UniProtKB/Swiss-Prot annotation:
Its EC number is 2.7.1.137. Keywords: ATP-binding, Autophagy, Cell cycle, Cell division, Cytoplasmic vesicle, Endosome, Kinase, Lipid metabolism, Manganese, Nucleotide-binding, Phosphoprotein, Transferase, Ubl conjugation. Pfam families: PI3_PI4_kinase, PI3K_C2, PI3Ka. Catalytic subunit of the PI3K complex that mediates formation of phosphatidylinositol 3-phosphate; different complex forms are believed to play a role in multiple membrane trafficking pathways: PI3KC3-C1 is involved in initiation of autophagosomes and PI3KC3-C2 in maturation of autophagosomes and endocytosis. As part of PI3KC3-C1, promotes endoplasmic reticulum membrane curvature formation prior to vesicle budding. Involved in regulation of degradative endocytic trafficking and required for the abscission step in cytokinesis, probably in the context of PI3KC3-C2. It comes from Rattus norvegicus. Residues 156-170 have a biased composition (Polar residues). Residues 740-748 are annotated as: Catalytic loop. Ubiquitinated via 'Lys-29'- and 'Lys-48'-linked ubiquitination by UBE3C, promoting its degradation. Deubiquitination by ZRANB1/TRABID promotes its stabilization, leading to autophagosome maturation. This is Phosphatidylinositol 3-kinase catalytic subunit type 3.
């Protein structure tokens, strides 16, 4: 008999340890009571059943035999829940294996709070500890929860956890038995097939649970292992035939805690004593010892999302004077402050001015919703003033979102009283964006183009601050002030704010925020109007841009209304563009292109305009530039580009950060600008989808050999082109992994003749993917073969570039996390789904818990998993067939 066919077991009477049971998760929905029940018992409104999030349930566990309890019940520790109930906690029962009778069963009751000092059962379930053959249960079990009753420990029980009363439960029971047989070695184990099978079983179980009217509690029983061998626990009782007396049980008395959820007076007193003014002089000269210093360094290195414990907060406060020389420690110190205590807040603000100035990138954290003190926020703005315009432009999208956390009254008070004689010069520049005249005072928005005066001022990179500026500026004043000095900043600030003003969702859901953005636009318009001649030119050019975009939107609507096929729509598009009397788009006065204001355009070339083959039919347009050249763009109407705009901004930022570390990965961060929630511009890059390359040329290497041949290069390809391809593959693999970009297929991977590979279409981010079981990164067999295969030097270089890029970006993780934290309230689809988890999703991809060496090994495993992902290859073929039949 082989080793695998042997059955290893141990008698229950010989296992002198306590029984342990793991409480996993609770699946299913709780039904709310009827209105009649609420009227009869008003306390129901204050129960966990009516909380917006998952109520704070707890589970009690007690062992019974013959209807009598064998020990006192144990319960799970307190744990708050947000979206699902998941305790994931091992309970040590006060009974040992030798003390268990053959008919022992465990009763599990789920409880919810019901007013002060009261609890009601959510449901109960009971399961025997030994199976029908006397084997102690092992592994995970899904137990049916009987609603609104306590678990019944009698025999037979009224709350059985293992039943097969329905067809779906028969299916779950059958799969559980098969899983058990596999675990016990009764089936042949095939690793790759087992992984797919267990995932499918898990999906079936989840589906059956959702379709059921019951809730299910997942529990896990301990497995016994010795020398890597799994042992079954068989019931056996020495001298079992001899009779023995049974102890009588007493009624258990539950003692409610009246102080639960109330203020802990001891902790409050300790907090006030630790932060009192008397401790200030003594704390001033405190120096930590080596152990405490290491602990402080660990706290300072925490990511922005890390919540400090009370002990850590007290430690940071105690050594606050020592930490004033560490700029990275400031945000951690401010998290320790209780701003509701005036004396403590006063101490913190006094120390803020003495702290070593923090980096500009770190100051973004102080503009998030977690920091509401106006002095702290203005300190962050003061640090932002040290950033040059180029850096400020990289954060501008997030800074516009950070206005949501400013004091709205301060923004409104910054408006100047309007004069009647200025009303004649205003226009309805926002009318096409969906903002009605009732919402906007027409004298306070961007005006019609003024007579041309002089060219706008060039972009400035100066860090100096003029003497006339107020050092106590709020964020709104700061952004407007800087925008008035830089035409590029003014351009993007205008369009970012316009989109927020036009957002109908914000207008309906949060009218105060909508009104705030309108006030920002009014203040911006006033500031431009008050400026000198060059600043007023900026204002007129912005109005001209708005007029140009309005006409373009009107044109696209007319084309979409045109009946017929794409050819007829193309003809209609070109005809309308050529009609200067109706549209006036082909020949306009020189204006900056909203997408890239450094490019000055004179109009659109009608004969080159065309529509793409897609549902929304975006238009490819060629703009005539100031120097007589062409600038190709894609104008999309009917699509919200804000998500693409965010991802391309982050990719552009990452490219800049990597270049700062002397790592050029040949990325292609093309420009995207949403001019509304329904339309916007995208830069057009001449390229070919990888799917088309494979169809026409057979392989990526054939494509390169066709356009960049070389007798001396690798595989007959120019060495420069191959190097560009390898680096761009590495860059986008790492970046799309960090951002959780989904729906990756060969049609949204594009390739240029110079070897640059880049991604488009970012409709799924932060881990969302319409395809099942997606690989961690898009790296398929065809892409690897384009490098020469897994044994080639180019592939090894690709892996090295991935490791290097990942390590560099990890060092800038705080900046990236701060930028995402400012976007949590933006109406971006994949962020709006779970805004509270957005930053955590990105942080998890960085694996900040690993050392650099461990991070390299982790990236190695991700690459290997992606290259050998079998299911992803199957999905790619399905997508290919779908595209074929669509055509």
């Amino acid at each position: 008999m082989g080793e695998a066919e042997k059955f290893h077991y141990i008698y229950s009477c010989d296992l002198d340890i306590n029984v342990q049971l793991k409480i996993g998760s609770l699946e299913g929905k709780r039904e709310q009571k009827s209105y009649k029940a609420v009227l009869e018992d008003p306390m129901l409104k204050f129960s966990g059943l009516y909380q917006e999030t998952c109520s704070d349930l707890y589970v009690t566990c007690q062992v019974f035999a013959e209807g009598k309890p064998l020990a006192l019940p144990v319960r799970t520790s307190y744990k708050p829940f947000s979206t699902r109930w998941n305790w994931n906690e091992w309970l040590k029962l006060p009974v040992k294996y030798p003390d268990l009778p053959r008919n022992a069963q465990v009763a599990l009751t789920i409880w919810d709070v019901y007013g002060p000092g009261r609890a009601v059962p959510v449901g109960g379930t009971t399961v025997s500890l030994f199976g029908k053959y006397g084997m102690f249960r092992q592994g995970m079990h899904d137990l049916k929860v009987w609603p609104n009753v306590e678990a019944d420990g009698s025999e037979p029980t009224r709350t059985p956890g293992r039943t097969s009363s329905t067809l779906s439960e028969d299916q779950m029971s059958r799969l559980a038995k098969l899983t058990k047989a596999h675990r016990q070695g009764h089936m042949v184990k095939v690793d790759w097939l087992d992984r797919l099978t267990f995932r499918e079983i898990e999906m079936i179980n989840e589906s059956e649970k959702r379709s059921s009217n019951f809730m299910y509690l997942m529990v896990e029983f301990r497995c016994v292992k010795c020398d890597d061998k799994e042992y079954g626990i068989v019931y056996y009782e020495k001298d079992g035939d001899e009779s023995s007396p049974i102890l009588t049980s007493f009624e258990l008395v539950k003692v409610p805690d009246p102080q639960m959820s109330m203020e802990n007076l001891v902790e409050s007193k300790h907090h006030k004593l630790a932060r009192s003014l008397r401790s200030g002089p003594s704390d001033h000269d405190l120096k930590p010892n080596a152990t405490t210093r290491d602990q402080l360094n660990i706290i300072v290195s925490y990511p922005p999302t890390k919540q400090l414990t009370y002990e850590e907060q007290d430690l940071v406060w105690k050594f606050r004077y020592y930490l004033t020389n560490q700029e990275k420690a400031l945000t951690k110190f401010l998290k320790c402050v209780n701003w509701d205590l005036p004396q403590e807040a006063k101490q913190a603000l006094e120390l803020l001015g003495k702290w070593k100035p923090m980096d500009v990138e770190d100051s973004l954290e102080l503009l998030s919703s977690h920091y509401t003190n106006p002095t702290v926020r203005r300190y962050a703005v003061a640090r932002l003033r040290q950033a040059d315009d180029e850096d400020l432009l990289m954060y501008l999208l997030q800074l516009v979102q950070a206005l949501k956390y400013e004091n709205f009254d301060d923004i409104k008070n910054g408006l100047e009283p309007t004069k009647k004689d200025s009303q004649a010069s205003v226009s309805e520049s926002l009318s096409s964006s969906g903002v009605s005249s009732a919402d906007i005072d027409s004298s306070q928005i961007i005006t019609n183009p003024l007579p041309p005066v002089a060219s706008p001022p060039p972009a400035s990179k100066s860090k100096e601050v003029s003497d006339g500026e107020n050092l106590e500026q709020d964020l709104c004043t700061f952004l407007i002030s800087r925008a008035c000095k830089n035409s590029t900043l003014a351009n993007y600030l205008y369009w970012y704010v316009i989109v927020e003003c036009e957002d109908q969702d914000t207008q309906q859901r949060d009218p105060k925020t909508h009104e705030m953005y309108l006030n920002v636009m009014r203040r911006f318009s006033q500031a431009l109007l008050k400026g000198d001649k060059s600043v007023r030119v900026m204002r007129s050019l912005l109005a001209a841009q708005q007029t140009f975009v309005d006409r373009l939107v009107h044109l696209m609507k007319a084309v979409q209304r045109e009946s017929g096929n794409r050819k007829k729509k193309n003809e209609r598009l070109q005809a309308l563009l050529g009609d200067n009397e109706k549209m006036n788009l082909s020949d306009v006065e020189l204006i900056p292109l909203p997408l890239e204001p450094q490019v000055k355009i004179r109009g659109i070339i009608p004969e080159t305009a065309t529509l793409f083959k897609s549902a929304l039919m975006p238009a490819q347009l060629f703009f005539k530039t100031e120097d007589g050249g062409k600038y190709p763009v894609i104008f999309k109407h009917g699509d919200d580009l804000r998500q693409d705009q965010l991802i391309l901004q982050i990719i552009s930022l990452m490219d800049k950060l990597l270049r700062k570390e002397n790592l050029d990965l040949k990325l292609t961060p093309y420009k995207v600008l949403a001019t509304s929630t329904k339309h916007g511009f995208m830069q057009f890059i001449q390229s070919v989808p990888v799917a088309e390359v494979l169809d026409t040329e057979g392989s990526i290497q054939n494509f390169f050999r066709k356009y960049a041949p070389s007798e001396t290069g690798p595989n007959g390809i120019s060495a420069e082109v191959m190097d560009t391809y390898v680096k761009s593959c590495a860059g986008y693999c790492v970046i799309t992994y960090i951002l959780g970009v989904g729906d990756r297929h060969l049609d949204n991977l594009l390739l240029t003749k110079t070897g640059k590979l880049f991604h488009i279409d970012f409709g799924y981010i932060l881990g969302r993917d319409p395809k099942p079981l997606p690989p961690p990164m898009k790296l398929n067999k065809e892409m690897v073969e384009g490098m020469g295969g897994t044994q080639s030097e180019q592939y090894q270089e690709f892996r090295k570039q991935c490791y290097t890029a990942f390590l560099h970006l990890r060092r800038y993780s705080n900046l990236i996390l701060n930028l995402f934290s400012l976007m949590v309230d933006a109406n971006i689809p994949d962020i709006a789904l779970e805004p509270d988890k957005t930053v955590k999703k990105v942080q998890d991809k960085f694996r900040l818990d690993l050392s650099d060496e461990e991070a390299v090994h982790y990236m190695q495993s991700l690459i290997d998993e992606s290259v050998h992902a079998l299911f992803a290859a199957v999905v790619e073929q399905i997508h290919k067939f779908a595209q074929y039949w669509r055509k």
